[in-house]
Amino acid sequence: MTNHEQVLTDYLAAFIEELVQAGVKEAIISPGSRSTPLALMMAEHPILKIYVDVDERSAGFFALGLAKASKRPVVLLCTSGTAAANYFPAVAEANLSQIPLIVLTADRPHELRNVGAPQAMDQLHLYGSHVKDFTDMALPENSEEMLRYAKWHGSRAVDIAMKTPRGPVHLNFPLREPLVPILEPSPFTATGKKHHHVHIYYTHEVLDDSSIQKMVTECTGKKGVFVVGPIDKKELEQPMVDLAKKLGWPILADPLSGLRSYGALDEVVIDQYDAFLKEAEIMDKLTPEVVIRFGSMPVSKPLKNWLEQLSDIRFYVVDPGAAWKDPIKAVTDMIHCDERFLLDIMQQNMPDDAKDAAWLSRWTSYNKVAREIVLAEMANTTILEEGKIVAELRRLLPEKAGLFIGNSMPIRDVDTYFSQIDKKIKMLANRGANGIDGVVSSALGASVVFQPMFLLIGDLSFYHDMNGLLMAKKYKMNLTIVIVNNDGGGIFSFLPQANEPKYFESLFGTSTELDFRFAAAFYDADYHETQSVDELEEAIDKASYHKGLDIIEVKTNRHENKANHQALWAKIADALKALN
């Protein structure tokens, strides 16, 4: 044992213990040499749960999914060099979707930077504006001041990551050799005796009385709508429904709002706006005077287009932090306050005669017609098309199941075909940067928190993150993956690129012709290829009772999927025109 090893051990023990005391319970470690002392010390901690993922890109998204589902800060650790760069996609997603990650990168000491040392690159501010904060940590030193410094940065990292708006932070640790700390006796047995832990308290933004009264006045007796995009706050669901009923306003609820599957059926929750807001004749009858938007922008493009063309209205965007979430540039009033506070204070101050019953009835009538057509079409078809897959998941998922939804077509199919249901289903997705990468790993991370967990994903997105399946095999995780295999990029069939047949398949369709049964075998998953509704139901039933990884593959046709969507939308449009 040398003095260097003791200094290294004490310094890192102080930092790690403070992370744990501030609320960190899990760390995802990517193996490497320079990060050895941090990895060993984390593994030694009696409370910290460790997951080791050999693929840094997968590790980043696994941590993201775990933090998203648990709403706790999760630590990521890697060695120096390009390992840290592989975290970048997950860091960007965490930043945009406000997920608390604490990214720790080991680095060469200062004397080995920019001199051609092996496995070394410039890691300072590596993630740029995609993190809330960056710190290049000091080298370990043997002094009380530096122990306090290490503890202080542990608390500070958690505080910044968890403070509204939540997000990732990056700490870079330059470390000198030798890199093996002292583990006997445990470095954590006496931790906390020399220095007190920092207690962190959080508050939320509120509005002053005059702003509240102004908002109440502007909403009373008006034709308004709530637009609720992705927002993972269960505590908002019932208060939002209650306020909507009092105002007589519809809630246009994105699948990731939580309102389509929070355990109750409410007619104020509108789930088929994507279908009927395509029609100009219908849109003209649904022009509001007030819009109040919560969460990020919903996935629906017809809804976005409708909101963009509204004019001469009050358009409130509510955000608890400092974000400016208004991509359509329609906001007239940006409200930075806690959402629950706003809902409660409006409920308390809104007069009982504030509603316009005819206005709400118009919305619910259109929605009822559209929903009944969707449900009837899905009930009557025996073809296992993409919409039918979503409808069957809606029917078959058990109470309190989790559903992680892939980007591209899956989230849009869920928007169309997952109507409101009186079951509690937790829906999650990576809708920050909206990438198709890292979705398998994110779902596996979320499966640590939610059980049973299902993943609905396209074939290209699944292929993109097959490496992530190693975590399921290694830790015997329970996840059921439903692959919608339309052999390529199905969403491009709905975009203008589809009108360029000369290059469409080579540049956008991108057929891979992969057989995923071999991927299932490689990672010890139970594999089910389903070609009928009965086979899908049987596979989901088996997977619900099986402990481990299940892969259910459904092969569909991109061109038929587009035609089916268009036929459904046309049928809804005709029915609504007849209603008028």
From Swiss-Prot:
UniProt keyword Transport present: no
Catalytic activity line of the entry: isochorismate + 2-oxoglutarate + H(+) = 5-enolpyruvoyl-6-hydroxy-2-succinyl-cyclohex-3-ene-1-carboxylate + CO2
Its EC number(s): 2.2.1.9
GO molecular function: 2-succinyl-5-enolpyruvyl-6-hydroxy-3-cyclohexene-1-carboxylic-acid synthase activity; magnesium ion binding; manganese ion binding; thiamine pyrophosphate binding
Cofactor(s) the protein needs: Mg(2+); Mn(2+); thiamine diphosphate
Pfam families: TPP_enzyme_C, TPP_enzyme_M_2, TPP_enzyme_N
InterPro entries cross-referenced by the UniProt entry: DHS-like_NAD/FAD-binding_dom (IPR029035), MenaQ_synth_MenD (IPR004433), MenD_middle (IPR032264), THDP-binding (IPR029061), Thiamin_PyroP_enz_TPP-bd_dom (IPR012001), TPP_enzyme_TPP-bd (IPR011766)
Alphabetical keyword list: Magnesium, Manganese, Menaquinone biosynthesis, Metal-binding, Thiamine pyrophosphate, Transferase
Domain of life of the source: Bacteria
Cofactor binding description: Binds 1 thiamine pyrophosphate per subunit.
Pathway: Quinol/quinone metabolism; 1,4-dihydroxy-2-naphthoate biosynthesis; 1,4-dihydroxy-2-naphthoate from chorismate: step 2/7; Quinol/quinone metabolism; menaquinone biosynthesis
CDD domains: TPP_PYR_MenD, TPP_SHCHC_synthase
GO biological process, one term: menaquinone biosynthetic process
Record text on subunit structure and interactions: Homodimer.
Family assignment from sequence similarity: Belongs to the TPP enzyme family. MenD subfamily.
Functional note: Catalyzes the thiamine diphosphate-dependent decarboxylation of 2-oxoglutarate and the subsequent addition of the resulting succinic semialdehyde-thiamine pyrophosphate anion to isochorismate to yield 2-succinyl-5-enolpyruvyl-6-hydroxy-3-cyclohexene-1-carboxylate (SEPHCHC).
Name of the protein in its database record: 2-succinyl-5-enolpyruvyl-6-hydroxy-3-cyclohexene-1-carboxylate synthase
Species of origin: Listeria monocytogenes serovar 1/2a (strain ATCC BAA-679 / EGD-e)
